[in-house]
Regions:
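Bacterial N-terminal signal peptides
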Residues: 7-16
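Short edge beta-strand/loop segments characteristic of extracellular beta-sandwich folds
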Residues: 87, 98-100, 220-224, 292
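Surface-exposed binding patches on compact interaction domains or structured appendages
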Residues: 181-203, 216, 223-289, 297-298
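Beta-strand-rich interaction surfaces with strong enrichment in secreted/lumenal proteins
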Residues: 72-77, 131, 144, 207-209, ...
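Aromatic, loop-rich ligand-recognition surfaces of beta-strand-rich domains
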Residues: 22-27, 33, 38, 58-126, ...
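Aromatic-lined carbohydrate-binding surfaces of glycoside hydrolases
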Residues: 291-292, 302-310, 316-517, 523-533, ...
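Catalytic domains of carbohydrate-active enzymes that cleave complex glycans
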Residues: 445-449, 456, 460-526, 598, ...
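Catalytic-core region of carbohydrate-active enzymes that cleave or remodel glycosidic bonds
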Residues: 538-619
Length: 705
C-alpha cells in the first residue's frame, strides 16, 4: 500500500522510478487504499474441504489451498501412496490445474489426478506417473485435455526421488483459465471485473476507440498471474499520429482498479493512481485507462502503448489506438446538461480530521469541487437550516447561516460562512444556481440561538402554520436583501427534498410572500400531478414517476427559463449508480435524459462519505455507494467516470441535433430508453441499448465537417 497525492488523475512516471520492491510507506488510513479481500481468480478449491491419507507432524492439508507459494508450508505424508482428496462446495468446470510440490531441494514426484462428480465414480484426468522433472517454485501446469466438470478432485503421489520422504504438496490451484507461469493480460470492456470474467482471450490486447475532440474516453485491461507478482507499475506513452500530431502522455492516464466492500461482496470501483500494487498468487488486477483528448487535437488515428510491469521483469504490453473525430465537445462549463450532485463539506472535514471551513478544509475541497465542475455541475449545495435531512447521513449537515433570536424578539442572521462558502464554490466552477436547504427539513424541526442565554433552541414547525411563517418570514426578507447586495438573488433557490404537495405549496407560498425574487427547487417522489399549480422553478422528478404528461411540460418549462430533471436514489435497483451497478447503467442515465428531452440529472450525493469509504462503500440501510460517487484522495470511481461519460453522450446528441446531424438510426436507438422497461431488464440488455446508442452517435458524428 502506498501513500498517494491528492490529485484525481495522476501518471506513473516511468523514467527515474526503479522497478522492483521498495520499502512501503507507513499506512495512513485516511489516504491509502486498502482492500478487505484483494481480487483473486476463481478457484473452486478456495472453500473446499480437504482430506488426506495421512500427515507428518503439523504439516496438514490446510497449506494446499492457502494461496501462498512457500516451500516449507506444505502438506506432508511419509507413507506412499499419499492421497489428497478435495471436496468442492459445488460442481465446477476446469480445464487445467497448477500444482506445487516441495521445491526446497531438487525432488521428483510422480502422481496422477482423478475427478469425480459424486465421490464414488472416479476418472483419471491426468497421468504424471512417469514424470522426470524436479519440482520448482513455478510448479507444474497440468492440462486435462478437455474441460472437466466435477465436485471432487483427488491427487495421488505414487513415488518420490527421495526414498522414505513421502509426498509433499505446497499448493494446488484449478481454473478454466491458463495457469502457465508469467503475467497474463487482455483488453476488457469498461464493466465490472470479478473472478468470473477476469480472464479471457490473451490475443485481444489492443484497445481501440473513437473520440470527439475535448472528450474524456476510457478503456479497461486486466492482468492476472498464478504466482505472486510484486510491484505492478503502469506506464502509458503519448499517443501519436502518422503525421506527427500528439496527445501528450499527461493526457493518457492509467489507474489501478481497487476493490471496496459493497454489501456482502467486494466490487472493483476505486480508480487509484497509486504508483504500484502487489499482485498476489492467483490474483488479478483491472487497469483503467482515461484519455482526455485536447480540444485542439487534429483528427486522425493515434497510437501508443500501455505497459503493466512487475518485479523480475514480468510485463504485459497493450497497444492503444484512438481515432480522433472532427467533431468537438464544448467545454464542460458550456454544457447544457443540468447536473445536480449534492455536496457535503462536513463529511470531507471529518474524514480528513480538519476543522470545517478552515484553510486546510478548503484546500481539500477544491480538487473535489473542480472535478465536479469539470462535469458541468450547475448547482452549489448550501444549508440554511440545521440538520435539513435530519440524521440520515454519517456526518450531520449544519446550517451555514446561524439564526439568533434577540431579547427583544427580533432576529439576527450571520451570513459570513454562507458568503465565504458560496464564493469558494463559484471560484471552483460550481453554479450558477445556489440551492439552499431547507425551509422544510425532514422532521420539521428548526433550530435557533437564544441571544440572551446562548442556548440552542429547537422547535417543530410544520410548513403552512403561522409559527412556521413567523420563523421564516424575517429570515426570507433579510436573506433576499443580502443576496441582492451580493448579486446572487436571481441564482438562489429555496430547496426542498421529497416533501409532500401540502408542505411544498405552503413553503413556496411563504417564499413568494416574503422573498419574491428567490426561486423554488425540489426533487419530488410523488406523481407530478400532485404538484400541479405549484411554482417549481427547478423541478426534479424521481425516475419511476416520470410520465408522458410530465415530459410534455418540459419544452414549455424550458421556454419559461425553468429546469426539469430526474433523479435516482436508493431506488430503483436498476438503472442506478451503486458500487455494484453494471457500469453501462450510469451511461444509460445520461442517454435517458437526452432520449426523453429532460434537462439533466440529480443524485444524492457526490461526497457524502460513510465512516471509511475506501474500505466499505455502504452506509445504513441503503445500497452500497448510494451516498457518494467520488472517493477520498480524491480518487475517481468507475461509476463516476461512466456517469460523466453518459453526460458527454447527452451533450454529443445535443450538438448533433443542433447541427441537424441526428440520424434516423440515432433516433431509433434512443426510442428504447424507457424506465418501465429498463427496471425489468437485464444488465446485458441495458448494455446493448447503450452500445447501440453510442454507435449511432459515433456514426452521426462522422458526417460532421
Amino acid at each position: 500500500m502506498r501513500r498517494v497525492g491528492t490529485c484525481l488523475v495522476a501518471v506513473a512516471i516511468w523514467g527515474g522510478v526503479a522497478w522492483g520492491a521498495a520499502e512501503p510507506a507507513p499506512l495512513d488510513w485516511r489516504k491509502d487504499t486498502y482492500e478487505s479481500d484483494p481480487p483473486r481468480l476463481a478457484n473452486p478449491l478456495r472453500d473446499a474441504t480437504l482430506s488426506v491419507s495421512g500427515q507428518w507432524s503439523d504439516r496438514g492439508p490446510q497449506y494446499v489451498t492457502d494461496g501462498e507459494i512457500v516451500a516449507n508450508n506444505h502438506w506432508a505424508c511419509e507413507q506412499l501412496p499419499a492421497v489428497l482428496t478435495v471436496a468442492m462446495r459445488e460442481k465446477s468446470a476446469f480445464s487445467a490445474c497448477r500444482i506445487w510440490f516441495y521445491f526446497g531441494e531438487p525432488r521428483i514426484y510422480k502422481f496422477f489426478i482423478e475427478a469425480s462428480p459424486d465421490n464414488r465414480s472416479w476418472t483419471r484426468i491426468a497421468d504424471w506417473t512417469k514424470n522426470d522433472r524436479p519440482a520448482t517454485a513455478e510448479g507444474f501446469v497440468v492440462a486435462f485435455g478437455k474441460e472437466v466438470e466435477a465436485q471432487y478432485l483427488r491427487v495421488t503421489i505414487t513415488d518420490s526421488s527421495v526414498r522414505g520422504a513421502g509426498g509433499h504438496i505446497v499448493e494446488l490451484m484449478v481454473s478454466s483459465a491458463a495457469l502457465t507461469p508469467g503475467l497474463h493480460g487482455r483488453q476488457a470492456p469498461t464493466d465490472r471485473i470479478d473472478d468470473a470474467n477476469a480472464t479471457g482471450d490473451e490475443s485481444l490486447k489492443t484497445w481501440r476507440a473513437a473520440a470527439w475532440r475535448n472528450e474524456r474516453v476510457h478503456g479497461q485491461f486486466v492482468v492476472w498471474s498464478a504466482e505472486a507478482v510484486p510491484q505492478l507499475r503502469l506506464r502509458a506513452t503519448a499517443l501519436r499520429s502518422e503525421k506527427g500530431a500528439e496527445i501528450p502522455a499527461s493526457a493518457v492516464v492509467p489507474r489501478f482498479v481497487r476493490y471496496v466492500r459493497a454489501g456482502k461482496k467486494t466490487a472493483g470501483d476505486i480508480l487509484d493512481p497509486a504508483p504500484s500494487v502487489d499482485l498476489p498468487a492467483g490474483g488479478f488486477r483491472p487497469v483503467w485507462l482515461t484519455v482526455t483528448v485536447p480540444a485542439k487535437t487534429r483528427p486522425g488515428l493515434y497510437r501508443g502503448c500501455l505497459t503493466v510491469k512487475g518485479a523480475a521483469g514480468k510485463e504485459v504490453a497493450f497497444p492503444l489506438e484512438l481515432e480522433v473525430l472532427g467533431a468537438k465537445l464544448p467545454d464542460p462549463e458550456d454544457w447544457a446538461f443540468f447536473l445536480d450532485l449534492w455536496q457535503h463539506p462536513w463529511a470531507v472535514a471529518r474524514y480528513h480530521g480538519v476543522a470545517p471551513f478552515s484553510p486546510e478544509h478548503y484546500r481539500l475541497l477544491e480538487p473535489i469541487y473542480r472535478e465536479l465542475a469539470n462535469a458541468g455541475q450547475k448547482t452549489l449545495t448550501t444549508t440554511i437550516a440545521e440538520l435539513p435531512w435530519n440524521h440520515q447521513n454519517f456526518d450531520a449537515y449544519h446550517t451555514m447561516i446561524p439564526h439568533v433570536k434577540n431579547a427583544d424578539g427580533s432576529w439576527s442572521f450571520d451570513y459570513a460562512l454562507f458568503d465565504e462558502y458560496v464564493a469558494f464554490g463559484k471560484r471552483c466552477g460550481l453554479g450558477p444556481q445556489i440551492h439552499c436547504y431547507t425551509m422544510a427539513p425532514w422532521g420539521d424541526r428548526v433550530y435557533y440561538i437564544d441571544g440572551s442565554t446562548g442556548d440552542q433552541i429547537s422547535v417543530a414547525l410544520r410548513p403552512g402554520t403561522p409559527e412556521h411563517e413567523a420563523y421564516w418570514g424575517p429570515f426570507l426578507k433579510a436573506f433576499q436583501r443580502h443576496l441582492v447586495k451580493k448579486g446572487w438573488a436571481d441564482d438562489t433557490y429555496i430547496a426542498m427534498d421529497e416533501r409532500g404537495p401540502e408542505d411544498t405549496r405552503a413553503t413556496a407560498d411563504c417564499v413568494k410572500k416574503f422573498a419574491p425574487r428567490l426561486k423554488i427547487a425540489m426533487p419530488g417522489n410523488h406523481p407530478p400531478s400532485h404538484f400541479k399549480g405549484i411554482a417549481l422553478d427547478n423541478y426534479c422528478q424521481f425516475i419511476a414517476h416520470v410520465d408522458d404528461a410530465f415530459l410534455k411540460e418540459v419544452p414549455q418549462r424550458r421556454a419559461e427559463g425553468k429546469v426539469t430533471t430526474f433523479y435516482v436514489c436508493c431506488g430503483p435497483s436498476r438503472p442506478n449508480t451503486f458500487t455494484f451497478s453494471p457500469a453501462d447503467e450510469q451511461v444509460w442515465l445520461g442517454l435517458y435524459a437526452a432520449a426523453n428531452g429532460l434537462d439533466g440529472f440529480l443524485r444524492w450525493a457526490f461526497v457524502n462519505w460513510p465512516r471509511d469509504p475506501l474500505f466499505d462503500s455502504g452506509f445504513g440501510p441503503w445500497p452500497a455507494g448510494d451516498t457518494f460517487l467520488l472517493y477520498p484522495g480524491p480518487r475517481s470511481s468507475v461509476r463516476w467516470e461512466m456517469l460523466r461519460d453518459g453526460i458527454e453522450e447527452s451533450e454529443k446528441i445535443r450538438v448533433l441535433r443542433g447541427r441537424q446531424a441526428a440520424s434516423p438510426a440515432l433516433d431509433e436507438s434512443l426510442s428504447a430508453f424507457h424506465f418501465k422497461s429498463a427496471e425489468k431488464s437485464t444488465g446485458a440488455a441495458l448494455s446493448e441499448q447503450v452500445r447501440r446508442a453510442r454507435q449511432a452517435v459515433e456514426d452521426a458524428a462522422r458526417t460532421l465537417r
